[in-house]
């Protein structure tokens, strides 16, 4: 039996920060709306994060070539946020809600653990299985104060995951092939949305689950040529019949095509998200790369390399829409250059996004704003190791 690691860790951080409502400040100061410039449009927050943990891990070879590894950790996690300077209007009158708390404290103690089995089929192939449980501590979002809104919070989420797969290094180390299948469930999952005033908010849903697989292959068919291929498939879904999230709405008008059932609560329009995919979780992703090196007499080498990525259906918000998704996005890159002896330095020319694709990478749904990838970039790079 091998005792791998144990100990106690303590972490604490304290930060006072000033948060500005930059968009409104610029508008007010430029008189875009005919309003008086407001130099008081900021807040000061003091955030204190404290964490204590005790942990241990051990491994035991229960049979020849079969190793069991287990570990446990207990963590205390505390967050506090205090409003030091509230927002004010141009006349100096406080605009933070009088009934809202100016100090919020959240704390939780949770165990984390894992257990795994690894079997060495031969020196080049091993198979494994693993189960683990962890958590993400509570969260306080104090920045809403700059918009004259109360703090928003989310309690701890826990995750239990299962995975199994194999790793291999074959044919004289010329072929490496690894594959894994997995399933995980997140209880009390923390999600992001926006309220009816377009302010960001945090909330908890009952649970979410996901399953899928991933694989990677690296092959060197000849000495100076390396080919790589990787891929993953993923299914995710939120499981909570009672959770709703605000949708894209600006000046009282829903501005995107919402595909989920909706209800109106006050000025907000809410969509039911039960069964929806998690945001930013592509259904599939494939990556390929290739590199050819031409050795030179001085120990350096010339090289030519390329890569490509293909990403499947992805939703960028918790609710289903037509506009806030991407599907089948594609991007490729090329690079050629010279690498010095022992890879001490490299001089190269490169092209990113060779075909100048315009791919949606994210959205700010409360402002109807899109985030796209970079356009085609052509450049020269020089790098070195010291």
Residue ranges and their predicted role:
Residues 49-55, 110-113, 126, 159-165, ...:
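Transmembrane beta-barrel architecture of outer-membrane proteins
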Residues 68, 183-185, 203-318:
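Gram-negative outer-membrane beta-barrel transporters
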Residues 120, 126-136, 153-220, 226-242:
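Membrane-embedded beta-barrel scaffold of Gram-negative outer-membrane proteins
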Residues 63-67, 122-124, 159, 171-173, ...:
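Outer-membrane beta-barrel channels and translocator barrels
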Residues 2-13, 45-184:
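Structural signature of Gram-negative outer-membrane beta-barrels, strongest in the C-terminal barrel
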Residues 9-13, 74-80, 131-137, 144, ...:
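Transmembrane beta-strands of outer-membrane beta-barrel pores
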Residues 17-44, 79-107, 139-153, 188-203, ...:
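Solvent-exposed loop segments that connect transmembrane elements
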Residues 1-6, 61, 129, 162, ...:
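Conserved C-terminal beta-signal and adjacent last beta-strands/turns
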């Amino acid at each position: 039996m091998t005792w791998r690691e144990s100990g106690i860790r303590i972490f604490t951080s304290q930060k006072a920060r000033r948060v500005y409502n930059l968009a409104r400040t610029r508008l007010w100061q430029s008189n875009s709306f005919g309003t008086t410039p407001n130099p008081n449009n900021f807040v000061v927050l003091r955030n204190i994060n404290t964490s204590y943990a005790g942990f241990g891990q051990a491994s035991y070879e229960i049979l020849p070539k079969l190793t069991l590894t287990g570990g446990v950790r207990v963590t205390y996690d505390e967050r506090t946020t205090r409003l030091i300077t509230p927002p004010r209007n141009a006349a100096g009158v406080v605009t933070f809600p009088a009934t809202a708390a100016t100090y919020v404290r959240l704390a939780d103690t949770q165990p984390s653990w894992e257990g795994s089995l690894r079997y060495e089929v031969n020196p080049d192939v091993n198979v494994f299985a693993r189960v683990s449980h962890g958590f993400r501590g509570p969260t306080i979002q104090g920045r809403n104060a700059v918009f004259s809104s109360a703090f928003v919070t989310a309690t701890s989420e826990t995750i239990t995951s299962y995975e199994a797969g194999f790793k291999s290094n074959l044919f004289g180390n010329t072929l490496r092939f690894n594959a894994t299948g997995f399933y995980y469930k997140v209880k009390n999952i923390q999600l992001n949305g926006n309220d009816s005033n377009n302010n960001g908010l945090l909330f908890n849903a009952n649970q979410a689950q996901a399953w899928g697989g991933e694989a990677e292959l690296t092959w060197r068919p000849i000495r100076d040529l390396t080919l790589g291929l990787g891929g993953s498939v993923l299914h995710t879904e939120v499981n909570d019949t009672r959770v709703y999230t605000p949708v894209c709405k600006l000046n009282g008008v829903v501005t995107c095509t919402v595909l989920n059932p909706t209800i109106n609560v006050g000025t907000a329009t809410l969509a039911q998200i039960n069964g929806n995919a998690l945001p930013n979780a592509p259904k599939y992703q494939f990556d390929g790369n290739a590199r050819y090196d031409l050795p030179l007499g001085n120990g350096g080498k010339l090289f030519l390399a390329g890569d490509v990525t293909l990403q499947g259906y992805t939703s960028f918000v918790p609710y289903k829409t037509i506009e806030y998704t991407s599907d089948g996005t594609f991007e490729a890159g090329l690079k050629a250059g010279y690498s010095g002896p022992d890879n001490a330095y490299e001089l190269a020319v490169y092209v990113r996004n060779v075909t100048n694709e315009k791919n949606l990478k994210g959205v700010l749904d409360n402002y109807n704003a899109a985030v796209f990838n970079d356009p085609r970039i052509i450049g020269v790079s020089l790098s070195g190791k010291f």
